[in-house]
A protein has these predicted regions:
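A contiguous, basic/glycine-rich beta-loop/short-helix subdomain that forms a polymer-engagement track
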Residues: 332-357, 368-374, 477-592, 600-604, ...
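Conserved RecA-like P-loop NTPase helicase motor core
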Residues: 589-600, 651-762
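Mg2+/Mn2+-dependent nuclease catalytic core
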Residues: 66-163
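Walker A/P-loop
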Residues: 216-238
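Conserved pre-motif I regulatory segment
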Residues: 182-224
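A substrate-engagement module of RecA-like helicase motors
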Residues: 187-188, 194, 247-357, 365, ...
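Metal-dependent nuclease catalytic cores that hydrolyze phosphodiester bonds in DNA/RNA
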Residues: 1-87
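Signature of the SF2 helicase/ATPase Hel1-core->accessory helical subdomain module
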Residues: 235, 241, 262, 339-356, ...
């Protein structure tokens, strides 16, 4: 007797199903997409409150889950209906609310088939659960600029609703079969997958074990893993094993820079090379500007053939790319050209079918551009956060916003002569900036003025935000009427986005923020500054099952657990896998590089660096806390040490200039080279100069951020909230830069090199306690002759 075939079981969000099958038309980013989730949620709540007054039994955000069978597939469909109520004639109504910036004239009953489909599925689930013979489906559209409400209704029997859902499932069935077959093969392969190297590196097995446990059990892990452990493989391999065993995922590998995305891609490539039949899909999400196929990026159907008719062609393109296990930027561009679809959107759409998604922090943490398709609700996601020491700073930026007086004044000038509601609205905003400039000048006159003309407010400016809200309608109307991309359109469109960004931050403004007003000449700059992003980060991490935050520098763990929003995380710190004797570690203890001592320090700094370089011919880097200090030291060093080739980091270097700088660090140099750079800059982390391409670094000072009004606000805030203002605002961020800079030397077990710390503060307990265990052999030096002897001894050993 033949064994019965077990049904294929698949769970799908209703919205994902209907948008995939029924969305039509083109990509048009003129106004769609910007903060739609937040703005839509606000409008939803407003309309739901109004509906409750009209219908006493109106229930908002009703969670629905229904099981539907189609052939051998059992679908579980789930989602939240915006509203369900009983109409005056006794018929139950499902209300689906949508916000749109499209002109009201375009909003017809046939405006968006996917909206009807979504409401129909909800109605079918509700009718089946409550044994109703009929239901009504209502679409409620809110046109955001005119604040106009339009409603459309359709009546269905329970049988008709069931047939509509079955038609959707019949269309989706081939995709469901493919997804389930892939997942089954993937899990089997991952369970059998072996570690791709003959042996683990020192510390690597311990790290992988910690990562596996947190992925299996759920929770948060903070892992300090020094250079050489192989961090990318140490997190990806156990996360993938957990995916195979627990059937969780997808895995999000989140990075601060493109170079670390490459490290993740390389680790996956090694796994695929070791297991050629491995079923594993990955996609690398690349910024729109970098992956766009057009010379000028304008995402409208009129300007871009890849945007025009995108939704008619995307399913064919997706079916094709599902055969490709590794979707990089280049691969996405290739398939996008083949199918005439946008490569950026193709990457986003393919992410729903991927096992590993590699991308920037902002795809999870940025409230504007995070992946709504995943993060509207909680999932079994695994978040791997590389270079996590960068996360608090990046998160502060994501939750801050700034506007300048000039942008409003110039916009008004570009509009030319004559009166209009838009020019009037711009004038009113400009007037507030003028008032702020007067206040900044008055307050500065009453203080010492060492930080310039600036002042802070602990609360948002309700008046200013109200004027910006009033500005949006005429500004949006002007943009609707003037779509040619000339200078005026470009400036006003950017202003529109900047205003919307400001208002989004204003909606979250609380005691974690300050408002800073700064005047300089006729310019005035207003900035809403997020001082503490930990609550926002905690909310983001709560969307997933597990999170691993890892970096070579996460000390002290308590600080990073706090600011990264993972106070309950398990923290582990692994020892360096390299022999301690390969690194000469010295501290020049007879000099202060504090700001007030900078001029006096230059001679000893120069002597120390020159002694380091002369001890052995090779390539070296010297890191300074600021450009100004670096320029001073560079000029003096070149004058006094002409036999040593010197280069320096320039401000705002492009990729070509950075590459040219690093290209001078050649293996086996015949003449010494000393590069001058800034701590925390482009050469202070993420630079991998192996072997003898770099044999020493000099680090001038403990890297404390420059004292300024913002940094002092951070200090005051963390003193009040944590009792550790100086540590949080200055000492911890500074020492992280020091440790990152020191990590540029000794990149492999065979490397040998010197780290020279130049400042007497490095000897103090408050700084020593932040140094890693493998720095226990730090030797204090108090004169040049002693340094010469110690360097000679180190290189001779």
């Amino acid at each position: 007797m033949q064994e019965p075939v077990s049904p294929i079981q698949i769970t799908l969000p209703v919205r994902q199903l209907v948008e995939f099958l029924r969305r039509a038309g083109s990509i048009d980013n003129r106004f769609t997409g910007f903060d739609r989730a937040n703005e839509g949620a606000r409008i939803h709540r407003k309309l739901q409150r109004a509906a409750v007054k009209e219908h006493a039994d109106y229930a908002a955000e009703v969670f629905l889950r229904g099981i539907f069978a189609y052939e051998e597939i059992e679908f579980t469909l789930e989602g939240r209906a915006d509203g369900i109520f009983t109409a005056a004639d006794g018929v139950t109504v499902v209300d689906e609310i949508k916000t749109t910036a499209c002109p009201a004239a375009d909003i017809t009953p046939d405006f968006a088939p996917e909206h009807w489909a979504q409401a129909i599925v909800y109605a079918a689930i509700y009718a089946a659960q409550h044994e109703l013979e009929e239901m009504r489906v209502q679409l409620t559209y809110f046109q955001v600029d005119e604040e106009l409400i339009l409603r459309f209704e359709r009546h269905y029997t329970a049988q008709q609703l069931q047939e509509e859902v079955e038609a959707l499932l019949a269309e989706y069935a081939p995709w469901a079969r493919r997804a389930v077959e892939w997942k089954k093969a993937r899990n089997s392969d991952l369970q059998a997958m072996q570690f791709p190297f003959p042996a683990y590196r020192p510390g690597q097995r311990a790290m992988a074990g910690e990562v596996y446990k947190v992925c299996r059990d759920g929770g948060r892990l903070l892992c300090q893993a020094p250079t050489g452990i192989g961090k990318s493989m140490s997190v990806l391999f156990p996360a993938l094993k957990s995916m195979g065993n627990e059937s969780v995922g997808p895995i999000f590998y989140l990075t601060a820079r493109g170079t670390t995305r490459t490290a993740a891609e390389n680790a996956l490539a090694i796994l695929r090379d070791t297991e050629p039949e491995l079923h594993l899909r990955s996609v690398t999400l690349t910024a729109k500007d970098k992956i766009c196929l057009c010379e000028t990026r304008e995402c409208t159907p009129e300007a871009c053939p890849y945007a025009n008719g995108y939704y008619a062609r995307i399913k064919g393109a997706l079916w094709d790319v599902l055969d490709v296990p590794c979707l990089t930027a280049e691969t996405l561009q290739e398939y996008a050209e083949r199918h005439t679809v946008c490569p950026f959107e193709l990457g986003l759409d393919s992410s729903l079918w991927s096992d590993v998604i590699i991308g920037d922090y902002n795809y999870l943490f940025d409230p504007v551009v995070h992946l709504v398709r995943f993060f509207e609700s909680v999932g079994d996601y695994i978040f791997l956060v590389d270079e996590a020491h960068n996360l608090p700073g990046r998160a502060r930026e994501m939750h801050s916003a700034a506007l300048t007086k000039t942008s409003f004044y110039e916009a008004k000038k570009l509009l030319g002569k004559g009166k209009s509601s838009l020019k009037n609205a711009l004038t009113k905003v400009n007037d507030v900036f003028i008032e702020w400039r007067h206040r900044a000048e008055e307050e500065t006159a009453a203080r010492d003025g060492r930080f310039g003309k600036t002042f802070f407010l602990k609360e948002r400016s309700e008046e200013f935000d109200h004027l910006l809200n009033r500005l949006c309608e005429p500004l949006k109307a002007w943009l609707d009427d003037h779509r040619e991309p000339d200078e005026t359109h470009t400036a006003l469109l950017q202003l529109y986005f900047d205003v919307r960004a400001w208002l989004r931050v204003a909606d979250t403004f609380d005691d974690h923020f300050v408002l800073q007003i700064t005047a300089s000449g006729s310019e005035v700059r207003a900035a809403q500054l997020c001082l503490d992003p930990s609550a926002f980060l905690a909310d983001s991490f709560a969307l997933g099952r597990a999170a691993v935050l890892f970096s070579a520098t996460l000390a002290p763990a308590s600080y990073y657990k706090d600011l990264c929003g993972v106070p309950e995380a398990r923290a582990v710190a692994l020892r360096s896998p390299f022999p301690a004797g390969n690194q000469g570690l010295f501290c020049i203890g007879n000099v202060s590089t504090r700001y007030k001592d900078r001029d006096a320090s230059l001679a000893i700094v120069e002597e120390s660096l020159a002694t380091m370089v002369r001890a052995r011919c090779g390539n070296y880097l010297a890191f300074f806390p600021s450009y100004a200090y670096m320029e001073q030291a560079y000029a003096q060093f070149k004058e006094h040490c002409p036999e040593i080739n010197c280069i320096k980091q320039e401000n705002a270097m492009d990729e070509q200039q950075k590459a040219a700088f690093l290209a001078q660090f050649v293996p086996g140099p015949r003449h010494p080279l000393l590069g001058f750079a800034v701590m925390g800059g482009v050469f202070g982390e993420g630079v991998d100069l192996t072997g003898d391409r770099l044999i020493g670094v000099g680090i001038v000072g403990p890297g404390l951020p420059q004292v300024g009004p913002r940094q002092e606000q951070l200090r005051d805030y963390f003193e009040q909230t944590r009792g550790s203002g100086f540590d949080y605002a200055y000492r911890y961020p500074g020492m992280n830069k020091v440790l990152q800079a020191a990590g540029r030397v000794i990149r492999t077990p065979r490397d040998k090199g010197v780290v020279l710390l130049i400042d007497n503060r490095f000897a103090m307990p408050d700084y020593r306690r932040l140094m890693p265990p493998h720095w226990s052999h730090l030797k204090m030096i108090y004169d040049t002759e002693e340094l010469e002897r110690e360097l000679w001894r180190f290189w001779e050993e």
